[in-house]
Amino acid sequence: MRQVCSLLFFCLISLGVAAQDNASSQQCAPDGIAVGGFDLVSYHQASGPLPGDTGFAHQIGELTYLFSSADNLQTFLSDQQRYLPTYQGFCAATLAMGRLACPDYSNFKIENGRLLLFELAGFTNGRSLWNSDPVGFRQRADANFQTLVK
């Protein structure tokens, strides 16, 4: 019975991963507004994430990033790579586990100066999982990102 359950679990995970081929951060932004409309620069400030304003917007590809002020927009434009979310905005912890999930944009961590976003669903807190083994989760997420997203 245990072998059957393990095989079934593996098959379900494999199907989920296969269905995510050619994934893009667009799937977490069906309306084209990235990061749930939150200001990327504000994640790095004491205030924490602030809602962006359409008056301070910047487009990258098909995604529009909103900022809460002209100053934050200019800060972003001066160093975009610093402020763009790691793993194109997918949940870092679930990516480490081999699947893609859209995060809860209020569940985040700044690690080594980079924004990590995490799922928060029911009893699953991606940030807590990540914090239990940040080095291991980072290694697995980096490896999975190469195959699942890029």
Which residue stretches match the model-derived regions?
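N-terminal signal peptide c-region/cleavage motif recognized by signal peptidases
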Residues: S14-A18
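Intrinsically disordered, low-complexity terminal tails and linkers in eukaryotic proteins, enriched
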Residues: Q20-G61, R82-K150
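Mature extracytoplasmic domains of secretory-pathway proteins
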Residues: L66-S68, N72-P85
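Compositionally biased, low-structure terminal segments
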Residues: F10-C11, L77, L84, Q146
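Sec-dependent N-terminal signal peptides
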Residues: V4-I13
